[in-house]
Regions:
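Accessory terminal regions of nucleic-acid processing enzymes
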Residues: 1-334
Length: 334
């Protein structure tokens, strides 16, 4: 499949923010676009369900203001990644024998205004460059086997849906391919992948991102999966007070969860998937109990952040009791 205007739109992407301008802070701007109906490259994998840390449900909860967005800008891995990025770009340019430009802009897609992009680099011959740094043994093994992790493929193809920007000598043309450069060791060259763009993948990705943004707009949560991320987020969905009888579909998930629970070491994700399905359905129906199947239960917990704040303000230990809050409901299978 060749790139089409239904994927790329017409013309160069619009510059939303120029991070070289004084007073324009990348982290502050990025946080703004983490809310509402926008999808950035690093969020594409969550939409597709291949992000190992953030599920589609969690991303939906965060974008709709139902769940806090963790600030990872000060995490060591993120800081080191930012520091090493220009070094890895330089190494990659030397390995490929081409000049790589680092555009310091946030772009908006001309046809799909929910898609934003911030490119790590663009080669002089029109290839998209993405840089990663990691010490993950699993990813190192994939690099050695010539495999690209699915979450990175999603991010790369999100960016590939944009045309080359206005400052490039080939402005307005589709990207000619992509380069993924992965640094896993300070004393070794990065793994460099020089690949073609899968335009069918891009087409499917746009469709799924559009559907996801409509879910954010309409307040409709995506189906939870069996990830830890979904298991935490599903507990934050509102639960009502009513009851209902179990349908055949609910009984099927209920039995599958119980079967998986007998051997959680090998079926933990399956167990969470079926349990999360029931929990999300109960939220949708605004009930707290499915007779003979499941019910919710709440407990009190200590909000440590609030406790620290109160103690710092008043230096009064008895305020501990004021810092207790009701936890999100636990789902109990019967």
């Amino acid at each position: 499949m060749e790139p089409t205007s239904s994927i790329l739109g017409e013309g160069c992407p619009e510059v939303l923010h120029d991070f070289d301008q004084q007073g324009v802070d990348f982290n502050e701007i990025r946080r703004l676009y983490q809310f509402g109906e926008y999808i950035g490259g690093s969020e594409a994998a969550s939409v597709l369900g291949c992000n190992p840390y953030t599920s589609a449900l969690t991303l939906w909860m965060q974008k709709s203001g139902r769940e806090d967005i963790p600030d990872i800008s000060d995490k060591p891995a993120v800081r080191w990644g930012n520091l090493l990025e220009p070094i890895v770009l330089s190494e990659t340019a030397e390995i490929l024998g081409v000049h790589i430009e680092k555009p310091n802009f946030m772009y908006l897609h001309p046809l799909y205004p929910f898609m934003t992009a911030n490119f790590d680099g663009v080669t002089e011959d029109g290839r998209l460059v993405e840089v990663k740094t990691t010490d993950s043994y699993k990813i190192k093994s994939m690099m050695e086997a010539g495999q690209i992790p699915p979450q990175w493929m999603a991010q790369i193809h999100h960016y590939a849906c944009f045309r080359l920007p206005e400052w490039h000598s080939m402005a307005g043309e589709p990207f000619k391919g992509f380069v993924l450069s992965v640094k896993t060791h300070m004393q070794k060259d990065p793994y460099v992948f020089d690949e073609d763009i899968d335009w069918v993948y891009c087409e499917d990705l746009i469709k799924k991102e559009h559907e996801f943004c409509l879910m954010v707009k309409n307040g409709t949560p995506p189906q939870p999966d069996g990830s830890d991320s979904s298991s935490e987020s599903v507990r934050l969905l509102p639960i009502g007070e009513g009851e209902m009888e179990a349908t055949d579909e609910i009984r099927s998930h209920h039995q599958a969860a119980k079967d998986a629970a007998r051997d959680k070491t090998t079926a933990e994700k399956a167990y969470k998937f079926h349990k999360n399905y029931i929990h999300a359905l109960m939220s949708e129906k605004k009930i707290s109990k499915i007779r003979g199947c499941a019910y919710t239960q709440t407990t009190s917990r200590l909000n440590q952040s609030l406790l620290k704040k109160r103690l710092a303000e008043h230096n009064l230990s008895h305020l501990i009791e004021e810092c207790k809050e009701e936890s999100p409901p636990f789902l109990k299978l019967v």
